[in-house]
């Protein structure tokens, strides 16, 4: 019996162990609010699930073949009190859940700015095959598979894809948002304290999907300024030629930085007028950039 239960115990421990860097271990206000929403929704649903399980066990025990005290009434097909309980409680649960989800969904709108004393930092995100490109338009630097942000500072993300549809997710900081070619989605996050938080693609996007990961490094504001100065003094510029090489499909790409980038580079990627996977399609169609919600 103990040996049979061992795999179940080990799988449960492994599952709970993964929560140390997931949605149940938030490191920002958005992720904390989402965890509370998840816990509240689960608790409300357990109000129905637990009584149903207990009632099933109780009915199975009471109406067992050996219980001669159990009364069988095959002629009865309606009982008002039972009907009231069966329909009213689920209806109330649905209404309560709807209210909780409605309020939470609007409060956690990914486009909504996060109130904070510090001015927000803008970061443009581009999904490539199979890596993430982060452009800092105000600092005019860029990084691949490494997101460095100052702790306690709201981060305003603009996201797009230079290839297939993808999904951007940092579980410990907050919401998952889709990226699409020729479009822009928006996301606002904040890291409460310095730390390193794993991020990844949450949507299958091809052969190198499993390696499409990055590290979000939250550092003190002074360290962020020092990092920007270091990036500006090393590496190469992110121009059309460098981007064309970067945009080629590749797996397990190590972190890299670019010391300079044109201020309109992100817009050119959206419009598909820069060399890359969407260049031919953009040259043929020249679709205007569309901006949608996160």
Report the location of each language-model feature.
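Structural signal for membrane-spanning alpha-helices in multi-pass inner-membrane proteins
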Residues: 14, 56, 97-101
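N-terminal secretory/membrane targeting signals
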Residues: 1-21
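Non-transmembrane, membrane-proximal soluble domains of secreted or membrane proteins
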Residues: 20-37, 61-294
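Alpha-helical transmembrane segments
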Residues: 37-65
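Alpha-helical transmembrane segments of integral membrane proteins
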Residues: 5-9, 40, 82-86
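Alpha-helical transmembrane spans of integral membrane proteins, capturing the lipid-embedded, hydrophobic core
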Residues: 8-11, 46, 50, 87, ...
